[in-house]
């Protein structure tokens, strides 16, 4: 037991990256989406991506999560059996399998991430069934378990998400993604469009789950309060480029780039 | 039909079997591909066929493409040979292809069907043509064609079980009773067309060729003879066919698919075989159900013509 713990902690100190982006660029015609972005993400680490609207955060996230091929640059991921691999060189079925097992994607708009005509339990169970679960009782039990983890009432398990509030839909999306125990989860403005009190509760929940499960995450937001609470490290984007990066507290408390200073001061005014 | 000339036994105002040769060749190519890849939906360039609304043209086009002058055609609609649609389709092919027609399953070389598989086991050499309104079993949950195509391509079928999961969570059991999805040859999930799930087990290892035509969606698919066909289910909710506590009121069959028939406005009803030929055949062989002698029941029997014959023959 202690030997295992030791070797595991040794493994962590080696710091094998989970994902590595190198020179990632994506334009839409003449419009720059993101430009020459490079970074390394380690297992269990949470990176926040901040910047004003239009700074390229969603574009970057969509490329990293294999939803949008880049014009230039590579995105490598530590596949369970193959090690670091360029995700855009995987075959499409392999990439799709990765996206629904080892990754999770929480969309800003729950409509993009949930099946609105399928019950909450069915939404959570879908990934399990996709990887071969064929025991109804077990799938349902797991669904109920995850509803509890995201603080949704078990009595809602057979209700459709279209009857849920925005905050509940977002929590259901999280449960639906985490059920296969992914190692990496992508989130685009996870608290966007929610009331402030609902936002705070969702953030608490997310922080708890990410810490408890040791999941790595890339969280895109224009809201510095979100990354303050969730992110270990921060990347600040402007006009598609990363202008500053570092540990969250350092960047927020002692911003070096003038643009970051502006961002931080404007949030202080809010 | 009376005006048929000697050299051709069909109405020569039409090309044989109505469709032009090029169209039939195109459909046959699609059929060959479909047979080679069991359960895979092959797109084809569909044509219009003259028929009553509600029948769709997919099955008709397939039948027109496989039928030859020496074939014998049977047409069933919900198990019955004598509905308006079954009669008019039979008459149509008699006219445009000059083929013999029959109600007897064992005599037919081509059987066109909507909603049932005959009770009598099919033989090698027979062709069963299904009329299909919606070929895509995933469509209800995934409206995007690009996505369902990928799901089939990569055998990503989790969604199919989501559909069954939803059934159980709502009704306590898999409530889907027709169009019940099957896995063909361990590879493609397929809609069996709106047959009752009672008929699903008949598709497996069937000796006949099973061809499916969807006219509106322009898709053809097939199950070659002796192919594995498994109905999807859960370990703790295994697939089951419908069962009835009673036997057929007319022929006493206990292993056939029964339709409920209302006899009067006082709650009188009976359950009879949906396969009218199967039922009549059994009665002809002397099998009797509990209401076989009841005149009201006889009057309501679907295939009254055949039943009357039986009365004469049987006694
Ligand atoms: N699909 C698209 N087509 C054209 N331009 C786009 C598209 N998506 C984003 N853009 C543009 O790319 C830039 C970055 O957008 P985006 O990545 O959405 O930024 P953010 O998420 O930070 O608001 C913006 O100028 C935006 O207008
Ligand atoms: Mg965005
Ligand atoms: Zn009967």
Stretches found by the model and what they are:
Chain A
Residues 74-97:
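ABC ATPase NBD Q-loop/coupling interface
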Residues 160-164, 168:
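Conserved ABC ATPase signature
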Residues 50-52:
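The feature captures the beta-strand-to-loop junction immediately N-terminal to the Walker
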Residues 245-246:
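ABC ATPase "signature
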Residues 65:
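Helix-to-loop junction immediately C-terminal to a conserved catalytic motif
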